[in-house]
Structure formats: structure tokens, C-alpha cells
């Protein structure tokens, strides 16, 4: 691995990490989730936590933070240790998304609604104990409009630093661009609370049924397409030859609804992040939306800004470290929308994300390293 670029060294300690993950002790998770489900995840964690392998990895994490992944990683569950990990990695602030328990908190059941509230109370307190350095975002179950709006009001008043919303199905059986949801977006805008969608929002890793937004699992029912490490700590998502390549489809559909449905026009200061879907899809989407807007203009449907301009202003996405950010910018522009992430402590984030992204940003230009690692991400860290 090449040495850290001088421009990256200059921003060390200021870096904003737009995708980290929060683990929970299995007993804490069981208390929060209750009857909502996820028992297999809890059982799996209980079998691992406290084993010789876990204890050895935890000890290693104190001196080799980047290499240890999963619940054994430094600060995976503990807010004080997470701050130590951030200092070690040169990161100023980090957004934390749930490691597991995605689908279970978003189904249309009373148990899911109760679990969602308990989770939100937990992460608001956790974030305070991390001195606001590590910001664990709340989750909003959007199967019922009135409940979703009431819970959003509640967590905003509690001091939520962001909210994660589902993107596998239309919220409360209608488009997120429907005027019915305007009060929801207005509250986010007025409170300066970022909204996020995240890979796995349909619970593909924790549900037997298909993710409604993605191709049926039968398409990947082949030995050569199955997950690479389904049982490895930190590899809970279906990382493999198929899933990661199609997982961005949910983000494309949701973002298309918001842009073409006028949500960012009605709420110009709304902050929105599409997290861990990668970034290679964003430039082509912008091109398609701009072309379609030009066609619509010929029949009297007009947008004050180009769709790509709304995206550059309001939306941030997290490239994977294997994606050539410099090439994407050369081809499509949209440089403002790309932000840094580690995926820590998930294994997909790798051990050298700062160096790898630094090599790419250096090829873009002298100023882009600071933009990518710090300035672009400020939209998601009000």
C-alpha cells in the first residue's frame, strides 16, 4: 500500500466518515427488538461473543484497529471506544447505521413499531455518550403515515442526528414524492435532520422472502452467485457476485421519485444520503434524468433545475473503495455528491480506505481531496 498522500495527511483529523455501523451486545439487542424478530442474529452473536476468537480479536483491535472487523472491532458497541477508534483512524465524525435488525423494525406490526421506538431511544443516548463524534442515526418505520410522522417529530425533539428510512417498498403504500409526505420532508428540512437510505433496507440478509425492490432471489440461486462469506463476522450483508451489483436499484428508484417528483424543488434545503449502494450508478442516472427532463420540457412539464443539479445540491452517495472515483468524475461530473466512508467495522470497507480513496482524489485535482474527505460530507453532518 502506497504511503498516505500529503493532501490526505492535511485533512487527517477532519475526515467525515459517512458510513459506519453500530453493533449491539446480543442481550441489549434482544431487549430492544423484543418480539419483532431477528432471534437468529441474536443467537449467532451470543455463540460468538466471549469466545477465544472474539477475545483475541478484541485485544488485537487495540493496536491494529483497521484489521479487526465485526463485533470484536474497537468501539463496535461501546461509544467511548468508538471515539478512540475514530481518533486512531484520523476521523473527526462518523455516521453509524444499524448493523442488523433492518427489516425487523420496519414491518407493519405493533412489535416492530415498539422496537423502532426503543432503538431510537438507545441510539440518541449512545450518540450523546460518544460526544456527538459518532452519530448513530434513528430509524423510522414508514408503514403507517401518522405513526411515522409522530415518531419523526419525537426523535427530532430528542436530538436525532439523522433518520434512516426504508426504500424497499413505497412508504405507507404511496410514493415518497406524494404531497401526503410533504410534512415529513418539511420537518426534516426545517430541523436540519438528514434523511438516509442504506443498502439492505428491505432486509435481504435477514428475511426469507424476496426484497420487493430487487430481482427475486431465484436469479442468484447458483453456487457461483452465492455470498462469499455469509457467516463471517462483519460480513452479514450478502456480499457476492450478484447482490452488490444489483443492490443500487432500490436507491435509483427512490432517488428518481424524489427528484422527478419535485421533492427537492419543494424542499431545497433537504439533506439526503444514499449510503453503501456504491456510486457507479449515479452519473448514468443523472444523464438519463437530464435527458428525460429535456424531453418533458417539450410537452410542457418543466423543472426549474436540471435533475442532476438537484442531486449535486441535495444528495450524497458513498463510493466503494474499488470504484474509480476519478474516472467517474471525468465521465459524469457530479463531483459534489461523492463522500468518504469506511463501512467500519464491516469487512467490506477494507483495511486501507483512506489511502485508496486518497490515491483517486489526488488524480482529480489538488482541491478535491479536501472536498471528498471533508467538504462534500458536511451536508450530512449539520
Located regions from the model:
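Divalent metal-dependent hydrolysis catalytic cores, especially in the metallo-beta-lactamase
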Residues: 65-74, 83-106, 133-139, 161-165
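Aromatic- and glycine-enriched glycan-recognition loops and surfaces
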Residues: 72-80, 115-121, 146, 173-186
Amino acid at each position: 500500500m502506497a504511503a498516505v498522500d500529503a493532501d490526505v495527511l492535511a485533512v487527517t483529523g477532519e475526515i467525515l466518515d459517512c458510513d459506519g455501523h453500530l453493533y449491539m451486545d446480543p442481550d441489549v439487542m434482544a431487549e430492544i427488538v423484543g418480539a419483532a424478530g431477528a432471534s437468529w442474529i441474536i443467537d449467532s452473536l451470543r455463540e460468538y461473543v466471549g469466545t477465544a476468537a472474539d477475545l483475541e480479536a478484541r485485544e488485537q483491535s487495540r493496536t491494529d484497529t483497521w484489521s479487526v472487523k465485526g463485533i470484536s472491532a474497537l468501539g463496535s458497541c461501546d461509544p467511548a471506544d468508538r471515539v478512540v477508534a475514530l481518533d486512531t483512524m484520523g476521523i473527526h465524525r462518523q455516521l453509524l447505521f444499524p448493523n442488523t435488525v433492518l427489516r425487523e423494525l420496519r414491518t407493519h406490526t405493533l412489535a416492530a413499531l415498539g422496537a423502532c421506538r426503543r432503538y431510537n431511544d438507545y441510539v440518541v443516548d449512545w450518540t450523546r455518550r460518544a460526544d456527538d463524534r459518532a452519530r448513530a442515526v434513528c430509524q423510522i418505520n414508514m408503514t403507517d403515515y401518522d405513526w411515522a410522522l409522530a415518531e419523526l417529530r419525537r426523535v427530532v425533539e430528542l436530538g436525532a442526528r439523522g433518520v434512516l428510512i426504508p426504500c424497499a417498498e413505497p412508504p405507507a403504500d404511496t410514493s415518497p414524492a406524494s404531497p401526503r409526505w410533504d410534512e415529513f420532508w418539511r420537518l426534516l428540512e426545517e430541523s436540519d435532520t438528514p434523511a438516509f437510505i442504506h443498502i439492505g433496507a428491505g432486509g435481504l440478509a435477514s428475511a426469507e422472502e424476496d426484497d420487493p425492490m430487487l430481482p427475486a432471489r431465484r436469479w442468484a440461486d447458483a453456487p457461483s452467485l452465492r455470498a462469499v462469506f455469509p457467516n463471517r463476522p462483519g460480513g452479514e450483508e450478502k456480499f457476492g457476485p450478484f447482490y452488490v451489483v444489483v443492490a443500487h436499484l432500490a436507491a435509483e428508484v427512490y432517488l428518481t421519485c424524489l427528484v422527478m417528483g419535485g421533492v427537492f424543488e419543494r424542499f431545497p434545503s433537504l439533506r439526503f444520503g444514499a449510503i453503501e449502494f456504491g456510486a457507479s450508478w449515479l452519473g448514468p442516472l443523472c444523464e438519463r434524468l437530464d435527458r428525460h427532463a429535456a424531453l418533458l420540457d417539450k410537452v410542457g412539464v418543466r423543472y426549474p433545475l436540471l435533475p442532476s443539479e438537484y442531486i449535486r445540491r441535495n444528495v450524497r452517495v458513498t463510493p466503494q473503495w474499488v470504484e474509480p472515483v476519478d474516472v467517474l468524475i471525468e465521465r459524469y461530473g457530479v463531483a459534489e455528491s461523492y463522500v468518504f466512508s469506511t463501512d467500519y467495522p464491516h469487512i467490506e470497507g477494507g483495511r486501507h480506505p483512506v489511502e485508496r480513496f486518497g490515491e483517486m482524489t489526488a488524480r482529480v485535482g489538488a482541491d478535491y481531496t479536501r472536498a471528498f474527505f471533508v467538504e462534500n460530507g458536511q451536508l450530512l453532518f449539520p
